[in-house]
Curated annotation (Swiss-Prot):
This is Glycerol kinase. Belongs to the FGGY kinase family. It comes from the Bacteria. One of its GO terms (cellular component) is cytosol. Pfam families: FGGY_C (PF02782), FGGY_N (PF00370). Gene3D superfamilies: 3.30.420.40. It comes from Agathobacter rectalis (strain ATCC 33656 / DSM 3377 / JCM 17463 / KCTC 5835 / VPI 0990). Keywords: ATP-binding, Glycerol metabolism, Kinase, Nucleotide-binding, Transferase. The gene is glpK. The lineage of its organism: Bacteria, Bacillati, Bacillota, Clostridia, Lachnospirales. ATP binds at residues 12-14, 265, 308, 312, 409. It catalyses: glycerol + ATP = sn-glycerol 3-phosphate + ADP + H(+).
Length: 498
């Protein structure tokens, strides 16, 4: 059998390729950042062609690093930034506009208008989601309504829609395969998570032609083969999942009640709820975790829009640090935040608040607060936001989390992990391999082609690096949580016109 599984990890700020072996070890890694476009306040875009070019480049680089050929790759799994919306010409393959990124808030007013029509419950029951500009549906409608000629071309069947994995599969197969997986489809706000089909009533409400939508398929199956022109031979594309669902799978959270948090650009908590969707009454969304072996597994999810992005803000805009990795060292220069709280609501607040008009706030400033306090408070804001979601999950599921599995770039920050354990009053378990998003995509692809025999086979690969136990006193924890809630309230509705 071929030696490796290739995971293509199409992130929000960079694309990566990781080659994994049977033990789940990383054998080769390549990564490249791509351009972020901010044409107006609250707008975020990517160039879909640049996403494709960088993804292909890092895949070739990862193979070259260890002299791997197409014959050495058993299958490819793809994981991706979710909700980000791409529309392209079916014949030429040219995107009609930049990709509209999940963080983009340009459709906030249209999302409000859907709520005002009393459609909140309809969307929640069918899609599991709250109505928000975050999801793909309003972005797709905006493209059809605002790109000259787009609606007419879509009605004629000339345009295709896809989230990033759909776009990459289409490009890798040179336009032969137009599919999405259930986990990504469940993030579009157009997919019925009960019937596993695009919802005709929602498509009619949004005026979106069904012909442009990809075919929904399980997360672990062979979708097609990569055209040999790219890697010198055909390779099956056998797995796909949105980044957060892939991380849940990579963390081997296979049982109902198991949960993970990924610290990336945003923070994303998912709890496996088994084969029945659990409806949230506390600002979470119900989503599909994965479809595999004829079964669909559901999850509760809390999405925090700004996490690692707040460290980028400290680096790029505030110039407080030279690199993201400096944040821990700088934050340790002070013993606390000196009463300062940072609420990084740069693009609104996600779960459990869902306030798209909230904006970033720093409160508790005195003459004694310096940049180290602000850096520490920014780190702490991630832990507070995660705890807000954990509290909502507990309320919805009735399950008291005994521990939290963590991954993503910022999980390497020991100070942040200790803050998380302290604020959430639960042990934080960090695995040896924190690249669980890419690993999840690799596992899904490998299962489909028999590289791994079973999910039990995969579970044996998970190994712990470090456990962070809560250390602060209960009264201090309660005081900090109370002050955080007070700070968050200051951010609400800031950008809304009175």
């Amino acid at each position: 059998m071929a030696k490796y599984i290739m995971a293509l990890d199409a992130g929000t700020t960079s694309n990566r390729c990781i080659l994994f072996n049977e033990k789940g070890e990383m054998c080769s890694v390549a990564q490249k950042e791509f351009t972020q476009f901010f044409p107006k306040p609250g707008w975020v875009e990517h160039d879909a062609e640049e996403i494709w070019a960088t993804q292909l480049e890092v895949a070739k680089e990862a193979m070259a690093n260890i002299q791997a050929t197409a014959a050495d790759i058993c299958a490819i799994g793809i994981t991706n930034q979710r909700e980000t919306t791409i529309v392209w010409d079916k014949n030429t393959g040219e995107p009609v506009y930049h990709a509209i990124v999940w963080q983009c808030r340009r459709t906030a007013e249209y999302a409000d208008s859907l709520k005002e029509k009393g459609l909140t419950e309809t969307f929640r029951k069918k899609t599991g989601l709250v109505i928000d500009a975050y999801f793909s549906a309003t972005k797709l409608k905006w493209l059809l309504d605002n790109v000259p000629g787009a609606r007419e071309r879509a009605e004629r069947g000339e345009l295709l829609f896809g989230t990033v994995e759909t776009w990459l599969i289409w490009k890798l197969t040179q336009g032969q395969v137009h599919v999405t997986d259930y986990s990504n489809a469940s993030r579009t706000m157009m997919f019925n998570i009960n019937t596993l089909k695009w919802d005709d009533e929602i498509l009619k409400e949004l005026d979106i032609p069904k012909s442009m939508l990809p075919k929904p398929m399980p997360s672990s199956c062979v979708y097609g083969e990569v055209n040999p022109v790219y890697f010198g031979g055909p390779i099956p594309i056998a797995g796909a999942a949105g980044d957060q669902q892939a991380a849940l799978f990579g963390q081997t959270c296979f049982r109902a009640g198991e949960a993970k948090n990924t610290y990336g650009t945003g923070c994303f908590l998912l709890m496996n709820t088994g084969e029945m969707p659990v409806s949230s009454k506390n600002g979470l969304v119900t989503t599909i975790a994965w479809g595999i072996d004829g079964k669909v597994v559901y999850a509760l999810e809390g999405s925090i829009f700004v996490a690692g992005a707040s460290i980028q803000w400290l680096r790029d805009e505030m110039k407080f640090i030279d690199s993201s990795t400096d944040s821990e060292y700088m934050a340790r220069k002070v013993k606390d935040t000196n009463g300062c709280y940072v609420v990084p609501a740069f693009t609104g607040l996600g779960a459990p608040y869902w306030d798209q008009y909230a904006r970033g706030t720093i409160v508790g400033l005195t003459r004694g607060v310096n940049k180290y306090h602000v850096i520490r408070a920014t780190l702490e804001s991630m832990a507070f936001q995660v705890n807000d979601v954990l509290e909502a999950m507990k309320a919805d599921s009735g399950i008291n989390l005994t521990s939290l599995k963590v991954d993503g770039g910022a999980s390497a920050n020991n100070l942040l992990m200790q803050m998380q354990a302290d604020i959430s009053n639960a042990p934080v378990n960090r695995p040896v391999c924190v690249e669980t998003t890419a690993m999840g995509a690799a596992y899904l692809a490998g299962l489909a082609v028999g590289y791994w025999d079973s999910m039990d086979d995969i579970k044996r690969n998970w190994a712990i690096d470090r456990v962070f136990e809560p250390e602060i006193a209960d009264d201090m924890r309660e005081k900090k949580r109370k002050m955080w809630k007070k700070a968050v309230a200051c951010a609400f509705n800031w950008a809304k016109d009175d």
